[in-house]
C-alpha cells in the first residue's frame, strides 16, 4: 500500500468508525457487530503505526489510550465551576422556588435532572475538535486530564454536525457503571488488593491515572449536562440540552421541564424509587431555572448559583435476615464483628455483609440468631446495620453473644479501659495481626511499596519468608522466583519497590511502623519535633507531652511501644536495611507562606474535591497548624459532608469560624 492509498483508507476508516460510534452512543442502535467494529478499529491502528504522519487528533484509535502523563497541569477555568446548594426536604425546595419568584417577579419554569454520582469535568471544543478537559478542582482551577477523557467513547473527539460555534465548553459527570465497578473490585480481590470504596471514588481515581491505557480499559462513561459559550444561542437550558444531543453528546433522557414546584416534587418522588433501576450511582436531583436569561439575572453568590439547587437523596435502606456473625482481627488486634446477610440489592450493588462495629453495637441492636435487620449504605464498602425488625424475630431465638477468645489464635480477649473494642493481645503470634502490620507498612500513605498486595503478603508469611516489616528488606530474587505466580518481571517490580521505599521520608516511616494512636498527622508532628527515631525513643513522657498535639494517651502508647524488646530490635533492623529514620535537612518543614501563621484548623467530614490529607498539607504549607479537637483556642473548622453533628454544634457554641470546602479555598487564594 502506497501513501495515497493509506491516506484514503485511514480517512475512510475514521469516517466509518465515527459514524458507528455515534450510532451506538447517541442513538442507541447498531448496524455492525462489536467484532466487526473492533476489526475496523484494529485495521486503523495498524495503518496509523505504518503511516504515523496520517494519524489525526480525532482518530477513534486515540480512545485506546497509552499516553503516560507524569504530572497533570493546573488550568484556570474560563467559567468558575461552583458547587450547588444542597437540600434534603420538600419544604426547602418550595422556599427556593419562592426566592426565585420573588427575585424575578413572576412564576418560573424549571428543568429537573438526575444528579449522577461521579466526577465533574469541563471540556473545551475549538473548531469542532476536543481541545482540553479539566477536572473541577477547587472550582477556580483544575487538572488537565485531556488524554484520559479522550478514552471515554461517549465523548465526541469531533463534533458530527455541520454547524457549531468556533469555541464552546461543555460540562458533565464522568462515572463508572456498577457493572464495571464490580468487575474491577473482583479483579482487585483476585490479586489481593483492597476493594475500591464506591463507584464515585473509582471514577475519580481513574480520571487522575497517569497511564491513559489503563483508563481506557476501565470503560468510564459520561453524561453531559451543560453548554457554555460567550453568547447563548439557545433561550433555555432545555434547548441547550437538545443542542448538545444534536452535536453527538450523551445527554441523559431523564431530565424534565417542570412548570411549577409541584411538578418538581412529583419528579423527585418518581426518581426516589426509579433511580435504583439505573446502571449507575445517583445521589440526588438538580433543579435549574430553565430560562437562561433569568439565570444571568439571578446570578451567583460567592459559593453557588442562585438559579439552581440540588436535592440530595437519603441513604437507601433494605431489610434482610442475618445468616451468621464472623469476627475479624485487625493489625492492632481489635476484633470486629461482621454480619453475613442473605443477599439483598442495595444502592445498585448486591450486599452480603455488614459491619457490626463492636460489642457495644451488638448489645445496642440486641441481635438474635435469624433476626431480620435494616441495612443502610452510604459511601462505605461494607454497609451498616441500623436496626432490627423485632416483629420478624423467631420465637425462642438466642441472643448472639460477643466472643471471648480470638477467632484465629484462641488467646483470651482483653478490653482497654475507655475503649469499645475488644483486643487479642497476642500481637507477635496472631497471624492477621502480623500480616496486617505488614499491609499497613506497605500502603501508599506509609512506605508506598509497589508490586506487593495483601495476597502476596499472605503468601510470603505462609512460606515463612517474612515475620515482620523488616523482613521485607531481606527478600532475595532466588526466594521470590520460586513462588507461585511470580515471574521475572513481578519479582523485579517487588524488589525495586522495596529498594525505592528506603527513600521514604521519616514521617511516613514513623506512621508505617504502626505505633497505636500514631496516625499520619501525629507521625508528622512527632517527626518535626524530635527529628529522629533515636530522639523519640529516648523521650520521657514529659518531653513527649511538649510536642504539638500530643496528649497523655499517645505519649503512653509511644513509651509502651519502645519498652518492647522486639520493637527496639525492629528499629535496629530497619536502620541496617537503610530505611530513613531521621529528618534530612530539606525535610525540615519550611512553610511556603505565612498566610495561616498562628492559625489553627480542624478538618472534619468528606470533601468533594480534596482528600483530608491534601487540605492538611495546604494548611501546613501556608504556616497553619492542624488541631485534633474543638476548643476555644481553635480558629477554623473546615466542614465537609457527613461530619459529626456534635463537633459542628460545639464549634457553633464556641463561635469558631466554620468554612466550607469552597470557602477554605477562597481564603487560601485571597
Curated annotation (Swiss-Prot):
One of its GO terms (biological process) is DNA replication. The active site is at residue 115. GO terms for molecular function: DNA binding; DNA ligase (NAD+) activity; metal ion binding. InterPro entries: BRCT_dom, BRCT_dom_sf, DisA/LigA_HHH, DNA_ligase, DNA_ligase_CS, DNAligase_adenylation, DNAligase_N, Hlx-hairpin-Hlx_DNA-bd_motif. It is an enzyme of class 6 (ligase). It comes from the Bacteria. Keywords: DNA damage, DNA repair, DNA replication, Ligase, Magnesium, Manganese, Metal-binding, NAD, Zinc. CDD domains: BRCT_DNA_ligase_like (cd17748), LIGANc (cd00114). Its EC number is 6.5.1.2. The keyword Manganese applies. Zn(2+) binds at residues 406, 409, 424, 430. Pfam families: BRCT, DNA_ligase_aden, DNA_ligase_OB, DNA_ligase_ZBD, HHH_2, HHH_5, Nlig-Ia. GO terms for cellular component: cytosol. Its cofactor is Mg(2+); Mn(2+). This is DNA ligase. It comes from Cytophaga hutchinsonii (strain ATCC 33406 / DSM 1761 / CIP 103989 / NBRC 15051 / NCIMB 9469 / D465).
Amino acid at each position: 500500500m502506497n501513501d495515497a492509498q493509506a491516506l484514503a483508507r485511514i480517512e475512510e476508516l475514521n469516517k466509518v468508525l465515527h459514524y458507528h460510534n455515534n450510532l451506538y452512543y447517541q442513538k442507541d442502535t447498531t448496524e455492525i457487530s462489536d467484532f466487526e467494529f473492533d476489526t475496523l478499529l484494529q485495521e486503523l491502528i495498524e495503518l496509523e503505526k505504518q503511516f504515523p504522519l496520517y494519524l489525526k487528533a480525532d482518530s477513534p484509535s486515540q480512545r485506546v489510550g497509552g499516553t503516560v502523563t507524569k504530572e497533570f497541569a493546573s488550568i484556570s477555568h474560563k467559567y468558575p465551576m461552583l458547587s450547588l446548594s444542597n437540600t434534603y426536604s420538600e419544604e426547602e425546595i418550595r422556599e427556593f422556588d419562592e426566592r426565585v419568584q420573588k427575585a424575578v417577579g413572576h412564576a418560573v419554569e424549571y428543568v429537573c435532572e438526575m444528579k449522577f454520582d461521579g466526577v465533574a469535568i469541563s471540556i473545551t471544543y475549538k473548531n469542532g475538535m476536543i481541545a482540553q478537559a479539566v477536572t473541577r478542582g477547587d472550582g477556580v482551577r483544575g487538572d488537565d486530564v485531556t488524554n484520559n477523557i479522550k478514552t471515554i467513547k461517549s465523548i465526541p473527539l469531533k463534533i458530527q454536525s455541520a454547524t457549531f460555534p468556533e469555541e464552546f465548553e461543555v460540562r458533565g459527570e464522568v462515572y463508572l457503571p456498577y457493572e464495571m465497578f464490580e468487575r474491577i473490585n473482583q479483579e482487585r480481590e483476585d490479586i489481593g488488593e483492597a476493594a475500591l470504596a464506591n463507584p464515585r471514588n473509582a471514577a475519580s481515581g481513574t480520571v487522575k491515572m497517569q497511564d491513559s491505557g489503563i483508563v481506557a480499559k476501565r470503560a468510564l462513561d459520561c453524561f453531559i449536562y451543560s453548554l457554555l459559550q460567550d453568547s447563548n444561542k439557545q433561550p433555555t437550558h432545555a434547548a441547550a440540552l437538545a443542542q448538545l444531543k444534536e452535536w453527538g453528546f450523551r445527554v441523559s433522557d431523564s431530565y424534565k421541564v417542570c412548570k411549577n414546584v409541584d411538578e418538581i416534587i412529583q419528579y423527585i418522588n418518581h426518581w426516589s424509587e426509579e433511580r435504583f433501576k439505573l446502571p449507575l450511582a445517583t445521589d440526588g436531583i438538580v433543579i435549574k431555572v430553565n430560562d437562561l436569561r433569568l439565570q444571568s439575572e439571578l446570578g451567583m453568590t460567592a459559593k453557588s448559583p442562585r438559579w439552581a439547587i440540588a436535592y440530595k437523596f437519603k441513604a437507601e435502606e433494605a431489610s434482610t435476615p442475618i445468616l451468621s456473625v464472623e469476627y475479624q482481627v485487625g493489625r492492632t488486634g481489635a476484633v470486629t464483628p461482621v454480619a453475613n446477610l442473605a443477599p439483598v440489592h442495595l444502592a445498585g450493588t448486591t450486599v452480603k455483609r455488614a459491619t457490626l462495629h463492636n460489642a457495644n453495637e451488638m448489645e445496642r441492636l440486641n441481635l438474635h440468631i435469624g433476626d431480620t435487620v435494616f441495612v443502610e449504605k452510604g459511601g462505605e464498602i461494607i454497609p451498616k446495620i441500623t436496626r432490627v425488625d423485632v416483629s420478624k424475630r423467631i420465637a425462642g431465638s438466642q441472643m448472639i453473644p460477643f466472643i471471648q477468645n480470638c477467632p484465629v489464635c484462641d488467646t483470651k480477649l482483653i478490653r482497654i479501659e475507655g475503649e469499645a473494642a475488644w483486643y487479642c493481645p497476642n500481637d507477635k503470634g496472631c497471624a492477621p495481626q502480623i500480616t496486617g502490620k505488614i499491609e499497613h507498612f506497605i500502603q501508599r500513605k506509609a512506605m508506598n511499596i509497589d508490586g506487593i498486595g495483601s495476597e502476596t503478603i499472605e503468601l510470603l508469611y505462609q512460606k515463612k519468608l517474612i515475620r515482620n516489616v523488616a523482613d521485607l528488606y531481606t527478600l532475595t530474587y532466588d526466594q521470590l522466583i520460586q513462588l507461585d505466580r511470580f515471574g521475572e518481571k513481578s519479582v523485579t517490580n517487588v524488589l525495586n519497590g522495596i529498594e525505592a521505599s528506603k527513600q521514604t521520608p521519616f514521617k511516613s516511616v514513623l506512621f508505617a511502623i504502626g505505633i497505636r494512636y500514631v496516625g499520619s498527622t501525629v507521625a508528622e508532628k512527632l517527626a518535626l519535633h524530635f527529628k529522629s527515631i533515636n530522639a523519640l525513643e529516648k523521650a520521657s513522657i514529659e518531653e513527649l507531652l511538649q510536642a504539638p498535639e500530643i496528649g497523655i494517651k499517645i505519649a503512653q502508647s509511644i513509651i509502651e511501644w519502645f519498652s518492647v524488646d522486639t520493637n527496639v530490635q525492629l528499629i535496629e533492623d530497619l536502620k541496617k536495611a537503610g530505611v530513613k529514620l531521621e529528618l534530612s535537612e530539606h525535610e525540615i518543614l519550611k512553610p511556603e507562606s505565612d498566610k495561616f501563621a498562628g492559625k489553627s484548623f480542624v478538618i472534619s467530614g468528606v470533601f468533594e474535591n480534596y482528600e483530608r490529607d491534601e487540605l492538611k498539607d495546604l494548611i501546613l504549607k501556608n504556616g497553619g497548624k492542624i488541631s485534633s479537637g474543638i476548643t476555644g483556642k481553635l480558629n477554623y473548622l473546615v466542614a465537609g459532608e457527613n461530619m459529626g453533628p456534635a463537633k459542628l454544634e460545639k464549634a457553633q457554641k464556641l463561635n469558631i469560624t466554620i468554612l466550607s470546602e469552597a470557602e477554605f479555598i477562597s481564603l487560601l487564594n485571597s
